[in-house]
């Protein structure tokens, strides 16, 4: 089996639509729904208090995640950005759940597909743009022309800044998808190699796979962290401005 077979999108339910549209329910959609449910269940479990007053593992985990999100927003967008904690927290939990679920046996990594990560990135960047105009009006356009820019350099600076702004969702999407694809592919290749080895020689590569899986879990958390931090950095343009 090809190492890339794990990323194949499979139709689970055909939904006929006119004009050649295809909105069939796929394994990718199924695991995105599962990731959303896992995030919701984790939050619900964290809100429940134990009778003895002690904190559960889910409560501790969510508290750590919440503190990270608050810290990231305060560091990049300032106190004014704290009203958007639910949005940023939802982004982090969804990306993290998608990444982790993809590592599990029979799992599917929705964030390995650029279509999914690009949709997430467009939502983030579009939201930032709308919030920017909502908070600052037309003054939001100042992000394309830094204060003190010489007049002769202004057209080039506006072009560069506009290009960089429009490239944000693409760079966010490709970074996340590429890292998910790379890690899962390496594990699949080595796992297939181990299966073909003599049983006497298999334990060492098998142990190496376990190390790679642990590293992949770290990468899954790291990529969710990076995606969230960049979201708060972009949010700072809307809330704080330049």
UniProtKB/Swiss-Prot annotation:
Predominant subcellular localization, coarse grouping: membrane
Database matches in Gene3D superfamilies: ATP synthase, F0 complex, subunit A (1.20.120.220)
Subunit structure comment from the entry: F-type ATPases have 2 components, CF(1) - the catalytic core - and CF(0) - the membrane proton channel. CF(1) has five subunits: alpha(3), beta(3), gamma(1), delta(1), epsilon(1). CF(0) has three main subunits: a(1), b(2) and c(9-12). The alpha and beta chains form an alternating ring which encloses part of the gamma chain. CF(1) is attached to CF(0) by a central stalk formed by the gamma and epsilon chains, while a peripheral stalk is formed by the delta and b chains.
Pfam families the record matches: ATP-synt_A
GO cellular component: plasma membrane; proton-transporting ATP synthase complex
Cell compartments where the protein resides: Cell inner membrane
Keyword vocabulary terms for this entry: ATP synthesis, Cell inner membrane, Cell membrane, CF(0), Hydrogen ion transport, Ion transport, Membrane, Transmembrane, Transmembrane helix, Transport
Residue ranges crossing the lipid bilayer per the database entry: 23-43, 62-82, 84-104, 113-133, 143-163, 176-196, 201-221
Identification of the protein by name: ATP synthase subunit a
InterPro entries: ATP_synth_F0_asu, ATP_synth_F0_asu_AS, ATP_synth_F0_asu_bact/mt, F0_ATP_A_sf
Membrane topology label: Multi-pass membrane protein
GO molecular function, one term: proton-transporting ATP synthase activity, rotational mechanism
Family stated for the protein in its record: Belongs to the ATPase A chain family.
CDD domains (alphabetical): ATP-synt_Fo_a_6
UniProt keyword annotation of Ribosomal protein present: no
Role played: Key component of the proton channel; it plays a direct role in the translocation of protons across the membrane.
Transmembrane found in the keyword field: yes
